[in-house]
Structure formats: structure tokens, C-alpha cells
């Protein structure tokens, strides 16, 4: 929603776990117990939203053995903004790109691909840096900034930083771009050009503004105590160019990038099309009592009030 200059005012969370009542001793080697994952994920998710001041009005966790191998975490938000405050224009040569928000670190390097890799007992030692470190207060400041119509009307186009970092968030804004990675604010020294370009550190936004609007935009960012620096310019030549440490380390034609790489074809076989919904149950007068007890013992029918009250549903 922030990319669309909207203010987020409502959220929901749907998750999936295995049997959280299973004995700790039955946990697979190299894995965390389901109850630990379920509780920790809920506390982390709710902490972020509660600090921002975001009302989370629907929270539900489903339980199924299939979620042991791959836990489900689904989040969605609703945002809105006055139509006149949302400007959508095509960037032109000479326009500048401002990076605002959090600083860039090694956290999140490879996160987009890492989330789909096979996890092993060594993953906790080798894949920790793929996880981004959130900063809810920084995100709240950006939300406050984007509620200001005088700010959002200066923005021609914007992107938030997700998978791919600078490569994607800035790389998608225009066909021709010249990016100076040395100007990207860092959490600490020692990052090379590749790490700066692909880091998925959170709470960052990239916006396109006219050169004459840079000072006004940066001044508004400073009022909210948000770092904002010019890191790129839009160019006439349709190439994605990145400079670091006095050298050009990337120079790719847009027409090549637009091919989206090698096409992958995968065969798939649907094996469960006739499986009935878990909620669909049949009973009879003879088995009604036993069937009722079975339903009541199912985790999917148990009260989730304890989980739901972790999330603030009235703030905002």
C-alpha cells in the first residue's frame, strides 16, 4: 500500500501449523517444536503491528500435518488515500530517485530465494543472514510521512523494498537508471557492491521526484526523523547501471532484463482433486455423541482467543 501512497489502517493474519500439542520429544531432528514456532511467530508478527499502531482485526491459525514441512504465514492489509494525493506519472530523464527509511545491512541477503530452499540441520547456522531484521518504529515514521498529501503529491512513482533490494525496488522504477551504490546509507561498513544491491533490509522506500522537488521532499522526511538521500537518476539510455567504489559493476540493457530470464517448464500432477474439505463431516444418530466429541477435540475447532488477543484490534 505504501507504494500506492496509501495509509494502512487494517490487517489480517492467517497461519498454518502442525500439532502444537505434540510432545517436545517427538520433534524432528534439526527442527523446532510446532508450539515454539506457533507462539514465536505470533509474538513477532503482533509486536510489529502493535508498535506501528495497526489494527489487526482477523487472526486465525489452521492445523494440519502438512504444515509441519512448510509452515503457512499469510498477512494482508487494507489501505486507502484521497485520490488527489496519489500521482502516477512516468519517470522522465533527469528525474531523481530518493531512498528513504532504514539503513542497509547484510540482513536479508538472499532472502527471496532462501525462503524456498530446502532447510537442513545446518540452516540455522548458514541461513540466518537471509532473515530481515524489522524496525517497526521506522515503518511507523514512513506511514506518518505518507499521510501528508503535500509529500505524496511530489512523488511520480514509488516502490517499497522487498525481494531483490535495490536491484528490484529501484530497478523497476524506470527503463534507464544510473544508481550510485556508494550513496546508499549503511548500517555498518564492509558491504561490497553486490551485498548493497541485493540486500533486503526492511523499512526502505524508493521514490521518483523531479529535481526541483528534492529539497522539499527531503525536508519533510527530516521532520519525521527519516533519512532520505538521492541515490539514482533516470537516464535516456534504457540501461540499468550501477556504480560502486568508483567502478561500474552493472550495465544491463532493459530489453534483456524484460525477457525475465530462462523460461522454466515443470510437469505437475494433481493428486488430491477428489479429497473432501476437512470441515465436511457426516454423522448419524448412533455416532452423534462420538462425532461431536471428535469435533470438539479437533484443534481447528478450539477457541483461539488467546492467540487473537495478542494482536491489538482496536488501535489506530
Short names for language-model regions:
Residues 1-316:
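Glycine/proline-enriched, intrinsically flexible loops and inter-domain linkers
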Amino acid at each position: 500500500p505504501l507504494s500506492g501512497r496509501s495509509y494502512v489502517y487494517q490487517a489480517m493474519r492467517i497461519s498454518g501449523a502442525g500439532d502444537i500439542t505434540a510432545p517436545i520429544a517427538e520433534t524432528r531432528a534439526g527442527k523446532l517444536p510446532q508450539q515454539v514456532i506457533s507462539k514465536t511467530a505470533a509474538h513477532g508478527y503482533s509486536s510489529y503491528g502493535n508498535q506501528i499502531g495497526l489494527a489487526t482485526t482477523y487472526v486465525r491459525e489452521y492445523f494440519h500435518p502438512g504444515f509441519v514441512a512448510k509452515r503457512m504465514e499469510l498477512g494482508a492489509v487494507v489501505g486507502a488515500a484521497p485520490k488527489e494525493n496519489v500521482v502516477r506519472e512516468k519517470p522522465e530523464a533527469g528525474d531523481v530517485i530518493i531512498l528513504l527509511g532504514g539503513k542497509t545491512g547484510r540482513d536479508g541477503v538472499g532472502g527471496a530465494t532462501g525462503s524456498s530452499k530446502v532447510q537442513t540441520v545446518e540452516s540455522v547456522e548458514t541461513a540466518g543472514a537471509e532473515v530481515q531484521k524489522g524496525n517497526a518504529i521506522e515503518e511507523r515514521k514512513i506511514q506518518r510521512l505518507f499521510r501528508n498529501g503535500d509529500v505524496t503529491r511530489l512523488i511520480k512513482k514509488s516502490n517499497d523494498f522487498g525481494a531483490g533490494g535495490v536491484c528490484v525496488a529501484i530497478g523497476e522504477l524506470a527503463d534507464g537508471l544510473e544508481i550510485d551504490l556508494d550513496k546508499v546509507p549503511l548500517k555498518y561498513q564492509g558491504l561490497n557492491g553486490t551485498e548493497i544491491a541485493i540486500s533486503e533490509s526492511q523499512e526502505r522506500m524508493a521514490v521518483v521526484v523531479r529535481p526541483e522537488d528534492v529539497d522539499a521532499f527531503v525536508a519533510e522526511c527530516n521532520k519525521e526523523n527519516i533519512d532520505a538521500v538521492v541515490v539514482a537518476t533516470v537516464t535516456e539510455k534504457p540501461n540499468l547501471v550501477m556504480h560502486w567504489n568508483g567502478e561500474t559493476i552493472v550495465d544491463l540493457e532493459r530489453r534483456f532484463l524484460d525477457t525475465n530470464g530462462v523460461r522454466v517448464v515443470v510437469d505437475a500432477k494433481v493428486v488430491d482433486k477428489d479429497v473432501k474439505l476437512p470441515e465436511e463431516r457426516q454423522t448419524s444418530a448412533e455416532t452423534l455423541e462420538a462425532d461431536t466429541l471428535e469435533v470438539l477435540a479437533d484443534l481447528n475447532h478450539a477457541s483461539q482467543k488467546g492467540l487473537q488477543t495478542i494482536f491489538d484490534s482496536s488501535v489506530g
